[in-house]
Amino acid sequence: MDLLKKEYTGVTYISGPLLFVENAKDLSYGAIVDIRDGTGRVRGGQVIEVSEEYAVIQVFEETTGLDLATTTVSLVEDVARL
């Protein structure tokens, strides 16, 4: 892991291809993220909604094997900000 890469561990809910992460309001709509499960497997995803309480991430691959306790999210590519 890159020392400057922020990792989010507050995954609170998984529903189909959607992952809900608490305390991730600094993520931006459209940002590309890596989702890592407890075994180290990495999946890609994109932030599709951000609010004060949570961020919603669409996972590009299946979510089987992801669990709330061990899944982490890290930013790969942020979107341009004006």
State what each model feature region is.
Residues 1-7, 13-82:
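Acidic-enriched and Gly/Ser
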